Amino acid sequence: MIKIYNTMSRTKETFKPLVDHKVSMYVCGPTVYNYIHIGNARSIIAFDTIRRYFEYRGFEVKFVSNFTDVDDKMINSAREQGITVPELADRYIGAFKEDVQAVNVEPATLNPRATENIDDIIAFIADLMDKGFAYAVDGDVYYRARKFSKYGALSHQNIDELEQGASQHVDDEETARKEDPIDFALWKAAKGDEIAWKAPWGTGRPGWHIECSVMSTKYLGDTFDIHGGGEDLQFPHHENEIAQSEAKTGKQFARYWMHNGFVTVGDDNEKMSKSLGNFVTVHDLVQKINPQVLRFLMSTTQYRRPIQYTQASLQDAKNNLEKLQNAFINLNYRLQGAQGAADATVAEQAAQLETDFITAMDDDFNAQNGITVVYEFARLINVYSEKTAVNAEQINQLLTSYAKMAAVFGIELKQIENDDAEIDELVKQRDQARADRDFETSDRLRNQLKEMGVILEDTPQGTRWRKKDE
């Protein structure tokens, strides 16, 4: 039984979907004014891993993640680059799709864009105004936060404390326009030549919070299973989404709230962010390292915990990934001539590890415990691959189970095709030299292969080879 830590209740709760064997998920997507950085990728990969585990457990997942393609950052960036906001959005949505594909993120069921849902946003705001939850001031529209009795419930904050904080962070001009300092914008009146749309209360554009309320309920329904995002979105973004959505529908918005931890950098574990200038983009990093290494680092840490991004953590991820890949390759190699009987003990151990994996991941998607089980499975198949007699059917069963568990973390385990005839010939020459006890020639050929980036592994069944970093 899957248990989820619900930010709303601050407890682990047994997951009970609205519809049996189906999961509806909404995860806040990027504002597409630049390349995503590794901190953004943490959330994307964390929720992709959660989605993959639901699928591993037999659930059908409808996964919606939006693109914020109009806001202040979009407008400012487009102006700086001398292009339109839609052109900027198209550019970085394309870049986003390339980046997430590189780190093996499954495509969302839907990636709605805010600008494609303007009519729905206007209708949503009008409904809130009709219900008395929103008011217009000179073309702007604000939400009456105090009218929503549960405001602050998600972030566990008192509304009076929120009022005090709001009064310290809002400029005097905007404060004067609002009925209450904690009220927030649903619609912003157009300024100059900014991109804008016509609405009954004036030409302008939507606020950030209303976009997610509209797109999540439009594509998943008034109530859906899971809403996710980074922990920095709890307040005000997710708090405001709840206030908007539940005021409009009169129903519970999301049933489970999930928030991932930050990526930190430096000795003081500072949060990685564009505003602090301490970020590394996925676009740049995947050109320097195997993207699977970044995926491994991000997906094998429990999603609520922070990840410290260092060269050492990347190297550890690289080493562990190679161990898992090599275990797969070694066992796959034994398929040739595998005619022995199946090993009942190995089958029992494999079945137990599959059970252990489910136990680990059912506990709030505990990836650290889950990947530990995958390491244990790798050790099991390494031992089995060294047996004198192995069984082909059992090898395939082990490889299938192993690959399915690894795939939950977005790790692709597969046989690497070594079809280089020149290398094959050099390996054969070395094997013959070893058989002839011509160690000088054997060592010379090993060094030659090493210079070619080839790693050799001598086994009782023969010499296996692979190219470095594959």
Swiss-Prot record:
Its main location: cytoplasm. One of its GO terms (cellular component) is cytosol. Keywords: Aminoacyl-tRNA synthetase, ATP-binding, Cytoplasm, Ligase, Metal-binding, Nucleotide-binding, Protein biosynthesis, Zinc. InterPro entries: Cys-tRNA-ligase, Cys-tRNA-synt_Ia_DALR, Cys-tRNA/MSH_ligase, CysS_C, Rossmann-like_a/b/a_fold, tRNA-synt_1_cat_dom, tRNAsynth_Ia_anticodon-bd. Zn(2+) binds at C28, C212, H237, E241. It catalyses: tRNA(Cys) + L-cysteine + ATP = L-cysteinyl-tRNA(Cys) + AMP + diphosphate. Monomer. NCBIfam families: cysS. This is Cysteine--tRNA ligase. It comes from Pediococcus pentosaceus (strain ATCC 25745 / CCUG 21536 / LMG 10740 / 183-1w).
